[in-house]
């Protein structure tokens, strides 16, 4: 079961409960990518790094969307 974590203007991602995996996708559903294992861990670390940036960069959705677009 996937839980939505982030929904941006172009890209979003969901977390798969119980596995630690992520599903990245474009909001038009034309592209998606399933992250598991080390890839999921690296993605999670990148999102945590973005979330911990100081203002004015903290909570900047563009940085999160850029991180997702790298995988797609």
Each predicted region: which residue ranges?
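Short N-terminal "domain-start" leader segments
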Residues: 1-23, 27-31
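Short, surface-exposed beta-strand-loop junctions and turns on beta-sheet-rich folds
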Residues: 30-33, 41
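Mixed-charge, Lys/Arg-enriched low-complexity segments
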Residues: 37-72
């Amino acid at each position: 079961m996937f839980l939505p974590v982030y929904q941006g203007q172009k890209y979003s991602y969901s977390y798969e409960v119980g596995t630690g995996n992520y599903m990245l996708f474009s909001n038009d559903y034309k592209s998606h990518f399933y992250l598991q294992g080390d890839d999921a861990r690296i993605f999670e670390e990148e999102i945590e790094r973005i979330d911990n940036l100081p203002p004015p960069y903290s909570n900047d959705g563009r940085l999160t969307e850029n991180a997702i677009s790298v995988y797609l």
